[in-house]
Amino acid sequence: MTTRNKQKVIAKFRHTGQGIVTGLIERNPVSVGCNMYVLENGESGTVFKLKPWHQGHEMMAHGGITASILDEVMGYSNHTREYVEDLKYTPVFTGTATYIYRRPVMVGETYYGVGRIDRIEGRKRFISGEIIDSEGNVYVKGESIFLTAPSLEDSDEHVAYQPMTDSDPKEI
């Protein structure tokens, strides 16, 4: 069984949107409501607990929801790199993604999502990530190629951070 050591949380991304994964619950009641974090080792991370409306089979998360969570946390690894290395914001989007479902993610249980950049080749960012439990056991594994969006590189869009609170995890 593959496990992972927890990492210290060092920053929190700010969210204001209505998305299915990171949307604010008050703006999208069916959102997973994930906060995204910068981890000390340069990974991105999140903590989540799914609700019954996120299920596929009885009390099991729909694979599309877990894929969306992994896509989001892997995408945020680009912004984690920008934070850690003090780089300019670069918009990215998913080019390809593959998910391996090792065991069911259950509704009502707490899980963690983590993502990291494995390598960069030109506009391509090769990224991997996992959904794990509190013991570090892997439930879903993802690999993706993200592409930079050169037409948006000079936009005013940027990633913002917000202060950490006592309710934020200390490690993921």
Predicted regions and their residues:
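Residues located in well-ordered beta-strands
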Residues: 35, 98-100, 112-116, 128-130, ...
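Active-site helix/loop of acyl-thioester processing domains in fatty-acid/polyketide metabolism
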Residues: 43, 61-87
